[in-house]
Amino acid sequence: MKYIKQAIFVVISLFSAVLSANDSTQVDLDEIVIAASRWHQNIHSEPVKVTRLGFETTNSYNPQTAADMLSLSGEIFVQKSQYGGGNPMIRGFATNRLLYSVDGVRMNTAIFRSGNIQNVISLDPFAIASTEVLFGPGAVSYGSDAIGGVMVFSTLSPQLSKTEKPQVYGSATLRGATASGEFTGHAHVGAGFKKWGFLTSFTYSKFGDLKQGTCGPEDYIQKYIVQPNYLVGKSVNDIVTVNTNERLQTPSGYDQFNIMQKFRYAPNQRLNLEYAFHYSQTSEYARYDRHQRMRNGLPRYAEWNYGPQKWMMNQTKLESSRSNVMYDSLKVNGAFQIFEESRISRELNKSLRETQSERVEAWSANIDLRKDVLTSLSIFYGAEYVQNNVTSIGEGLDVVTNETSVVASRYPKAKWYSMGVYTQVEWEPIKRLNIAAGLRYNHYLISSDYSTAGYEVPFDEKQKSNAGSVSANIGLNWRPNRGWLMRLNYARGFRAPNVDDMGKLFDSADGYVTVPNPSLKPEYADNIELGLAKKFGTFLTIDVTGYYTHLNNAIVRRNSTFNGSETLSYEGEDCRVQMLQNAAVANVCGVQAGLDAKFAKWFYFNGRINYQYGREELDNGEKSPSRHAAPFFGRMALGFKHEKVTVEAYSLYQGACRAENMPEEEKQKTEIYALDANGNAYSPAWITINLRATYNIYKGLTLNTTLENIADKRYRPYSCGISAPGINFTVSATYSF
């Protein structure tokens, strides 16, 4: 009850402060969003908090990856285990408790794990037209996993010509950065005719080893550098040297390319057809935090890398606005995706290199319909089908003898199915009051075959599991006058267990191994939120949202047994057996607040603060801080914008997480955190000062420069396995036509 009272107190205090302000000004809160209902809607009719990042905002900041793009909002905390990482954390939830949607297609797969993921970096920030984040459960519209929030990415779409003359357009960008020696090149070009158009986009990025700052905890300095060294037919003699460059974080560099191709055909104004092809691939890249693990005073691993992360999507989309008795608008979306990832590890001075490779083939089909029954009443309904085919292989290679062997795969061979139907109603009973309610039924099925896993299991090798889930939401949005917006919403979300939950074998931390559990059931989240927004003329906007989420039947890691034993030999070490189980409840409450101001004609200020308090139940009944509830964090910016010039000073910050407030699971990861006087892991507070400038040299040509972390702070955001860049100068030039 303590954290509920804290959240209520903060919300009431901020509410009172806003109420005391003058509300005689007139405003118009008419931003268009699609995240809440899967259809374009005015944000003033939605009962949930939605944040939008448009193309212009993203383009002016030039983020390196889509993960960095999300952090621009100041409302999403991004965790990185390595430089090639990016794991969004929203309202105390992350990974497979968040939903990723790309052009209306579900990106989450059956192997999205509870540990940190980096699938979002497969998206190209240069090719994203807009990003919307729906905070809180969005299960009615999006199904399983949408517990903490939904990230809706809309990529660039081919434009059509409004005249008989073809329209040709495009953009090209070159960018470099000093902290990692980055080079990025991007180009997209499109042509539009009266009824059809196409768009081609390509981006290539090369990042070197990342350099951290010089002022901060010495615990973040890399002690040793390992150079793998072996001769086929002879021996292994890996070279370990003392790191003499305190800024260097190696190995951490990687490169990546993205391709997008779209075709569009619109025979008339009421019918639109699109085909899209996306492909993304990284190079092999090191998991930096694992390279910091020590054993007997030396690095444990000579190699610990992720293999190339690949993502491909073929998508066809049909949109129709030919009104009839069933619908006024219709969208049909079909997609086929392929995901490939792998993990490659070899211990120091050992000859066995283990590779676990995964491939997921994901088929999906969505149909969404909208019917405006009355001017004040709209009905949205639809259905979804998803199928994931999972293939997992474990292979060992002796680097001396070149002999191969079978090692444990990460997952069994499996298939995961999800089928859902939903309906939502939006009603405006009186002017300035909108009420929304929705209901969804979802059914999932998992079929697993452990005979290919490379180890024996204490249950039948062929397993099947299925269950149904009901989710719902009801909320209202009230605008008592043109300057006010108030939201109240209740939503229930769910997460069906996937192949990663039920079938994974992996080491979660030093001395622990997680084993399969095919008997898991869905977990459920109940969320209530209250949001208030007030706009004073054209110069000031204040937005405050308080929320509380209760997670029941939570899937958590607990000590267990495997084949009757509490320990299991894994990678040459006797490890304590753990298993994911429906064994806990978790609670998260928090406040998100924002302020946007314009003054003195050309100046602006904006700020975002986020406070969350999470607790989850341990196996002994005690409470621990929630792992994905980040410490207090936010962003502030003061800028000047006039005609061709924009100059902005901005600050990013995070509060401390003291040792006694660290989640139990994080306390074991001493290799990635600073250590206090007692040798306990903690996450220090930090703040950075940054400066950026944009200058439109002439029509179509823009120069962007940024000086990040001016004080050269050595800092590491909470739960990250690698430090953020030290002082970093970036420069980019963009030409658009």
For each of these PLM feature ranges, what is it?
Residues S180-F207, G216-E284, K310-M312, V373, ...:
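Transmembrane beta-barrel wall of Gram-negative outer-membrane proteins
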Residues Y301-S323, R410-W416, E461-R479, G483-L485, ...:
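Outer-membrane beta-barrel signature, preferentially recognizing the C-terminal barrel domain
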Residues S283, M294, I338-S342, G396-V400, ...:
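Surface-exposed extracellular loop regions of Gram-negative outer-membrane beta-barrel proteins
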Residues M107-P137:
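Short acidic/polar hinge/loop motifs at secondary-structure boundaries
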